[in-house]
Amino acid sequence: MNRTLMQMKNKTSEFWKNRSKLQKILMVSALAAIIIIGIIISVFASNSKMAPLYKDLSAEEAGQIKEELDAKKVPNELSNGGTVISVPEDQVDSLKVQMAAEGLPKTGSIDYSFFGQNAGFGLTDNEFDMVKVKATQTELSNLINEMDGIKNSKVMINLPKDAVFVGEEQSAASASIVLQIQPGYTLDQSQINGLYHLVSKSVPNLKEDNIVIMDQNSTYYDKSDSDAGSYADSYSSQQGIKSQVEKDIQKHVQSLLGTMMGQDKVVVSVTADIDFTKENRTEDIVEPVDKENMEGIAVSAEKVSETYQGDGAANGGTAGTGEEDVTNYKADGENTESGNYEKNSNKINYEVNRIHKEIAESPYKVRDLGIQVMVEPPDAKNTASLSTERQDDIQKILSTVVRTSLDKDETQNQNLSDADINNKIVVSVQPFDGKVNLDTNTEESSGIPLWAYIVGGVLIAAIIVLIIMLIRKKRAQEDEFEEYEYEVPQEPINLPDINEEENETAESVRRKQLEKMAKDKPEDFAKLLRSWLAED
């Protein structure tokens, strides 16, 4: 065993002496890196990952759970001011089941289950009323906590005593609620209205006017009517439509000009004025069929012709000056002269066009539109490199976009001329000094400089090459040692005669001969040692 250790020690020492200084530094560095990596891996492997078992605990609840975990000898950690308790991740589910079976955490709140568990115990009327109010508060708080954005809540209910006398006025109930809103969350008006309605319907004789809701920052939440919510929703909808119209026109113009000038040489901004007036109207229009002659279609016609000719034609009627006669009108029989009578009448019924329209106007119209365009010339340092003809082309394109985007009724009512359309367009030709060069900022955006990747890659490659060299060197030495181990020296080794003193023993003489040989002929001395080791 000792000889084996000596052989390994000698080989290691000889291997180390034959290495250059650079190789020694690389070997030590690689060994240190391997040791450090192994330590880091072992540290992370030994540390079990902790996961929250319960969150948002009170001091009392955290104390109860920690005491139970310590009794079970379960590793645990408290964080976030003692409100969060963590245990090993692989034990979270089992511990939750165990804690629930033991009734932990005990919140101290009374809910409706109290009446089922304590039905056999006697309670006075006052005690029963107190327990009932407490249970109602707890159940109502649990309902509120289920809403989005609410982390926790506390409810205080005040129920009046029943009236003793018939004529006595019954007092109204009241409720106060304090909400703990999650960070970064804002309750919308519909949620607030829902809270008021929920609390009002959960407590008898509780009007919504007697409810007060606040958050942890003392912000008061008031109930609002549905119209206010609809107005807010309408405003949000209108702003969304306006933004969408501007975005669509901006993309269209950016695509047109970007194709012509280059995407990085054009910046487009669009501002729109949208008319959201809604109009529903009914029109009953009557117009002639023949608009030139202003005549309709003849539906029916009636022609009457009446003729009389003869002597003694009576005028008929009650003429004369009698009681029923008309003054200055001849009575019957006064005139028997001959006469002629003719009467013609034409009656035609015309039908016209009757148009009934129920018109619902578009929910929005583009009332006004403005387009601002910034163009970088081909030569950024020379604004004159963008020709006037190209600028005129851009102006014409934008004029067409504005004219076709505006509502036709608005265009006709305002009598927009080409000059008016051009006033809605601005084209600015100037260099883009604030342009971001993505090529130069790639290294900065990554967060890690490029040279760090290069150095890291070189070090990793050097370590890999060094390990390969060491393995190959070790194999070569083992092969060489095996050759020496089985190789029998062919030439005898002559030891110099150094017997200077006759009285010396053979052992001392041999030792001196070996020392002299080691100094004068180290290679032969090494071969001799190998042969002795092989014999052993």
Swiss-Prot record:
Major site of localization recorded for this protein: membrane
Disulfide cross-links: none
Compartment list: Cell membrane; Bacterial flagellum basal body
Source species, domain of life: Bacteria
Membrane topology annotation: Multi-pass membrane protein
Family matches, as InterPro entries: AMP-bd_C_sf (IPR045851), Flag_M-ring_C (IPR013556), FlgMring_FliF (IPR000067), FliF_N_dom (IPR006182), YscJ/FliF (IPR043427)
Transmembrane found in the keyword field: yes
Region described as Disordered: 308-342
One of the GO BP terms on file: bacterial-type flagellum-dependent swarming motility
Annotated keywords: Bacterial flagellum, Cell membrane, Membrane, Transmembrane, Transmembrane helix
Subunit field text: The basal body constitutes a major portion of the flagellar organelle and consists of two rings, one in the peptidoglycan layer and one in the plasma membrane.
Protein's job: The M ring may be actively involved in energy transduction.
Protein name, per record: Flagellar M-ring protein
